[in-house]
Structures are given as C-alpha cells and as structure tokens.
Amino acid sequence: KYLAFLDNDHSGQTRRLIDVITAGEANDGAKLLEYAKSPDPSTRYWAAVWLGVNKTADGKATLLKLTADPVPAIRVAAAQALYRLGDPSKLKLLVEHINDPNLLVGMFALRAIEELGDAGKVHRAKIAAAQKSKYEFSRRIARRLTTKWR
C-alpha cells in the first residue's frame, strides 16, 4: 500500500485528482464516468463520490460495477452514491464493510449508513456492535445511531 511513495513524481496523480474533483464541482457527468474507469483507486473513489453527490442518473450502471471494485473504500462510496440515486439495494454492502480491516473503511461505511437516515435501522445489532471498534470515530457514529434508534 505504500508503493506510491516509491515514485517521487506524483504530479500526474495530483493533476488527475484535481481534475476529477473539478469535474464533480462542475457536475460534468461524462468526465466523472470516464474517471470512474481509471486504474488509479483514488480517482475511482472521487468519481464515485461525485456521481452520488451530483445524483448523476447516467452513473447508475457504473456505480453498480464499482460496488464490486477490489478497493473497499470505492465499494462503500459507490453504495452510498447509489443510495443517493434512490437505489437502496447496496445497504447490506455498507453493513458488511463496518468491520473492514481498514478502520477508515469501517468508519466510512458507518458514516454512509448514518447519512441514509433510518434505512440502516434494520441492521441495528451490527451497527451497535461497532461501538466496540478500535477506531474512536466508528465508535462515536455507532453510538449516535444506536442511541437514535432505541
């Protein structure tokens, strides 16, 4: 996971990330769909995030593909984006990522569930268990949700 640091010149990746975020801010769905195919995980992640933020209806098929991405954070971002597009079918995917070995992914999943309102309530037990997470922010989110859903 640290191989990126072996390359001294990150200007290409930096430029690409600026471009994908700028495309998101401009609501340029066509560019975001192209960036979602990038070999760079950071670029795919931000494309998925912005497709959801902008509720890009043309992005649904791409987001469905991204829910099977090899990178867990991208799967979470895609599932959250689909929910924003009115597709709740990947809620279970978010719940499955709560206990991801990468603690940030678990926190991202919990935060996405929190943003969905009461939809995650059916998974209350698994969310409540996250109050014992090693990551403080995951514990906080799980505690907020558990308290809210009593």
Give the label of every model feature segment.
Residues 11-20, 47-48, 78-79, 110:
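Boundary/linker elements of alpha-helical solenoid repeat scaffolds
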Residues 41, 45-53, 61-64, 72-88, ...:
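Alpha-helical adaptor scaffolds
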Residues 21-25, 51, 55, 82, ...:
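Alpha-solenoid repeat junctions
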Residues 10-11, 39-40, 70-71, 101-102, ...:
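Short inter-helical turns and helix N-cap capping residues of alpha-solenoid HEAT/ARM repeat scaffolds
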Residues 128-150:
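Eukaryotic acidic, Ser/Thr-rich intrinsically disordered low-complexity regions
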Residues 20-46, 50:
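N-terminal segments that cap or nucleate solenoid repeat domains
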Residues 1-6, 25-37, 56-68, 87-99, ...:
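Amphipathic alpha-helical scaffolding segments comprising HEAT/armadillo-like alpha-solenoid repeats
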Residues 14-15, 44, 75, 106, ...:
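Residue-level detector of extended alpha-helical repeat arrays and alpha-solenoid scaffolds
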